Amino acid sequence: MANYISSVLKSLLLLLHLVFLIQQHVDSASIVKFLPGFEGSLPFELETGYIGIGEEEEVQLFYYFIKSERNPKEDPLLLWLSGGPGCSSISGLLFENGPLAMKLDVYNGTLPSLVPTTYSWTKTSSMIFLDQPVGTGFSYSRTQQYNKPSDSGEAKRIHEFLQKWLSKHQEFSSNPFYVAGDSYSGMVVPATVQEISKGNYQCCSPPINLQGYVLGNPITEHAIDYNYRIPFAHGMALISDELYESLKRVCKGEYVDPRDTECLKLVEEFSKCTKGVCQEVVIKPLCVTETPNCYIYRYLLTTYWVNDVNVRKALQINKESIGEWVRCYFGIPYTHDIKSSVPYHMNNSINGYRSLIYSGDHDLNVPFLATQAWVRSLNYSIIDNWRPWMIKDQIGGYTKTYANKMTFATVRGGGHTAEYKPYETYIMFHRWINGQPL
């Protein structure tokens, strides 16, 4: 009898220990009221934390959550995924659509400063900025035994993250929910939307109040994205008429891994012509190093800021997570198993979800021509034809709306991500998320 009682007690103690460990990791969320480098208390509500993913919750995904500054009880809830794969979501928070930005002072050895922005999407929406896949930003694995990330696998992990996050934040379970991102997240976001939609029908209660998704300059299919660089470069006067006509005649519109020797030579000539161009926004100087007069200097300042011991303490970073933080880590063993996200867009449209697809019109990486091409391939009827959308009396870009609830828009003068035209992108998003015509 004594042995039996002892065994039961040991089992109970083990169970309590496991519960404690799970609580340590899964429920590790903290309200952040002050951040080093920002003067005074934060003028918005910021929460940071980890959510455990997997059977043993070995993967710990880190997030920043900012409540809507308007009406968090009713405003939409957005999940933001940065590209890469392997780029921290702080890229969105500090450069693209968050309420804070780096103050662009020359680094002098002291902690870089933060300043408030006027273009934050959190003015009208609550936002979760998620570091994914594992190995990105502050997300990490407690063991080496976990499923290596992939496009389709990330869609499932993100869905699991959302289910667990919403179970801890049930006050947001009825808010309209959207998935958003840019660049490489163009491969993951549509698959994530489909995964959530499938979960709502098959398994999960309560369902996530999924309404749609937002994508900026999304990578969609390598061949489409690359093939349209040539006509885009010609339109931007980066290559000559003669080279463009030769490329069209010899390569017949297929410029990816050409087997024809003459086509290969012409593609190499194209590469030489565009080698000195900033791929993200062709009108910006190409910067090799992060010097103070360069646009990407803010990335260096962010690295200094995030790696400060007091900043990491304020953000409640688990000490076991990572060593030095990097904005984009491209050493993640990642499987690119979705070759085209176009079928996911088609399925999501059939299921009735709204979508805003926007393109900075000076991006050479994913030209607006490529995005236009796959949107056009969906073959949906047009309900609002090509027209300028305005900010006061100035053209912010051009837009077209389709019968499948998809809106396509360009951002005039914009680049690969929203950071190049954050105010204009905010105006566009604000109108769309509130159901207004652009």
UniProtKB/Swiss-Prot annotation:
Database matches in InterPro entries: AB_hydrolase_fold (IPR029058), Peptidase_S10 (IPR001563)
GO terms, biological process: proteolysis
Tissues expressed in: Expressed in seedlings, roots, and siliques.
Broad EC category: hydrolase
Gene Ontology terms for molecular function: serine-type carboxypeptidase activity
UniProt keyword Repeat, yes or no: no
Record flagged with keyword Zinc: no
Signal sequence segment: 1-28
Catalytic residues in the record: 183, 363, 416
Record key words, sorted: Carboxypeptidase, Disulfide bond, Glycoprotein, Hydrolase, Protease, Secreted, Signal
Cysteine-cysteine disulfides: 87-328, 251-263, 287-294
Entry's localization field: Secreted
E.C. no: 3.4.16.-
GO cellular component assignments: extracellular region
Family: Belongs to the peptidase S10 family.
Role: Probable carboxypeptidase.
Annotated protein name in UniProt: Serine carboxypeptidase-like 5
